[in-house]
Amino acid sequence: MRLSDLRGRKVAVWGTGREGRAAVVAIAAHGPADLVAVDDGGSTVSPPWDGFLATAAPLVTGDAGAQRLAAADVVVRSPGVPNTHPWLAELWRRQVPVTQGTALWMADHAARTVGVTGSKGKSTTSSLISHLLAAVDQPNVFGGNIGVPTLDLPAADLYVLELSSYQCSDLTDSPRVAVVTALFPEHLDAHGGEREYYRDKLNLLAHGPETVVVNGADPRLAAELGDRPVVRAGTPDTTHVAGGPDGTPWFHLGDQPLFPRAVLPLVGRHNEGNLCVALAVLDVLGVDVLARRDTLAVAVAGFQGLAHRLTEIVDPSGLTFVDDTLATSPYAAMHAIDAYDGRALTVIVGGADRGLDYTPLRDHLAEREITVIGVPDSGARIVAALDGLPKVRCDVTGDLVEAVRLARRVTPAGGVVLLSPAAPSYGQFRNFEHRSEVFAQAVRDTAG
């Protein structure tokens, strides 16, 4: 379904955040017979609905909103509307077509788009792809989940999008190059279960992309994709890390060395994998990666890591404090822990409790000497899951500030204090930015 298909139709836009606002502006320009906006009360942070928005799409709330959705020819939902929402189940029962702004946009722009998703690494990888393309004279527009809604993007010859599982779920067109960085259970409450989450995430690949690029080291991706023909970044046939001319790790394309691993300023093997995926995407887009390796090395060296993703905080004590507040699952926390392998490490875990299974984290730490400090709400349950591991020291504190204070006392000189919560921020904090702010302030307040 394209935007132009909405001409003369009764359309309801469900959600009044930035995606809903972009949808109203775009749809209004295509002459729907009727256009309304529906707010189900699930968000309290949307700014006022006034001016052009109120004129083009009057706002309806409560039970009246549910009725307007059911009466529409097409419903355009915001990504924040979960698949488990009871109103959505009723729309599906009535066979009311439901789509999203990203799906409408993709129908017109798929052939010019690189779409990146993944349970972890999609923001960094999509940012790297856009950054490296620009460095080799391939101008592009970057947006999606990480930035500007797709329906607000300007005209361009090439787009790079970060796409969430929610945005992927309603796609009926795949981008020219579909990219998946990692796959593990996430957002299960919104998708209805693990299988449903994988289905929605991998819907990015379901509609005939020209090329699929994946992290070839991810076992779940390998299992889900089977023998499907894909480019498996991180394997010897394509972009990967191996010993280089000087004996240190280098990025390679096949058997050809590109530049040293040390050029990449981001820590962790998972970030090596993210860059391998990005370089593989450039390769399939026709960039002569080998010929442009010097230019790419300079661009990689200048890449600034994204906030709240293994962001190191300077501290006069000699300890390294690390903000990885966006690690909202045990698998993401495991990647962060691995990034500081070989250093004395204290990790702070806990947040909103979604009932996740922390057995994988326990297995990962079975032979690791580490201190784990739990904070509400799920911190005590995570710590309990680690009970009995001989090399893991565990504590539980009442809040994040107390956890930082304790971490200072128990972490050896030169060690790392890592906030990698393995849980979302809501409940104790307004959002992940607020959790990050509280952590950084606690580091400052407890210094000296």
Curated annotation (Swiss-Prot):
The record, for Pfam families, names: Mur_ligase_M
Which reaction is recorded as catalysed by this protein?
A: UDP-N-acetyl-alpha-D-muramoyl-L-alanine + L-glutamate + ATP = UDP-N-acetyl-alpha-D-muramoyl-L-alanyl-L-glutamate + ADP + phosphate + H(+)
Residues annotated as transmembrane: none
The GO terms this record gives for MF are: ATP binding; UDP-N-acetylmuramoylalanine-D-glutamate ligase activity
Do the record's keywords include Cell cycle? Answer: yes
- Reported EC number(s) for this entry are 6.3.2.53
Q: Name one GO cellular component term.
A: cytoplasm
Which terms does the UniProt entry file under GO BP?
cell division; cell wall organization; peptidoglycan biosynthetic process; regulation of cell shape
- Give the domain of life: Bacteria
InterPro entries, alphabetized: Mur-like_cat_sf (IPR036565), Mur_ligase_C_dom_sf (IPR036615), Mur_ligase_cen (IPR013221), MurD (IPR005762), MurD2 (IPR043687)
Swiss-Prot/TrEMBL keywords: ATP-binding, Cell cycle, Cell division, Cell shape, Cell wall biogenesis/degradation, Cytoplasm, Ligase, Nucleotide-binding, Peptidoglycan synthesis
Q: Which EC class does it fall in?
A: ligase
The metabolic or biological pathway listed in the UniProt record of this protein is: Cell wall biogenesis; peptidoglycan biosynthesis
- Report the function annotation for this chain: Cell wall formation. Catalyzes the addition of L-glutamate to the nucleotide precursor UDP-N-acetylmuramoyl-L-alanine.
Q: Which family does it belong to?
A: Belongs to the MurCDEF family. MurD2 subfamily.
The protein, known as: UDP-N-acetylmuramoyl-L-alanine--L-glutamate ligase
Q: Name the gene that codes for it.
A: murD2
